[in-house]
Amino acid sequence: MIQTILLEPMTFDMLDAVMAIELQTHLNPWQRRHFDDCLNHGHHARVLQTDGVVSGYFVAMMGYEEVHLLTFAVTPDHQRRGHARMMLEALVAWSHEQNARSLWLELRVSNARAMHVYQTAGFQKIALRRSYYPTPDGLCEDAQVMCLTLGVCPT
């Protein structure tokens, strides 16, 4: 069976579907207002649609010569199908178009599956942010900071 897979700009009318995925995939999910703010500020936000259904998304922000990946998710029933890789490739291509020199992200140190996806895409572990993410038991978890070098950094 052939699937139709499209990566499209995120719009406000897609946020119900995006929020459903956010709540399903993140221990400390964004609130709808976070997505509203990102769209209002013109951040690079895309949704992956599989056969007309939102199956993933990402939001990234352009800074001075760098892009920061703010949030990224694929529904559990669409994971391990290359969708994350496809979205990352699109984000990297866009980052190159913006003349960014690097692409940055943070993720929970316990998120081994995502860590593998990012490392396979060429991201390097740069640093830890101690006690960055809240956990359901009221404690905190470290974040792994990762970077993908896109161009030659100035000396």
Segments from the language model and where they lie:
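Short hydrophobic clusters on alpha-helical segments that form packing/core surfaces
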Residues: 91-95, 103, 114
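Conserved catalytic-core motifs of GNAT/GCN5-like acyltransferases
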Residues: 104-106, 119, 124-142
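Extended hydrophobic secondary-structure segments
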Residues: 18-21, 103-111, 132-133
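Structural motif
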Residues: 98, 116, 120-121
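Short glycine/proline-centered loop/turn elements that form peptide/ligand docking sites
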Residues: 88, 111-114, 131-137
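Acetyl-CoA-dependent GNAT
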Residues: 2-81, 85-90, 94, 98, ...
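Preference for well-ordered, secondary-structure-rich cores of eukaryotic proteins
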Residues: 53-54, 85-86, 102, 109, ...
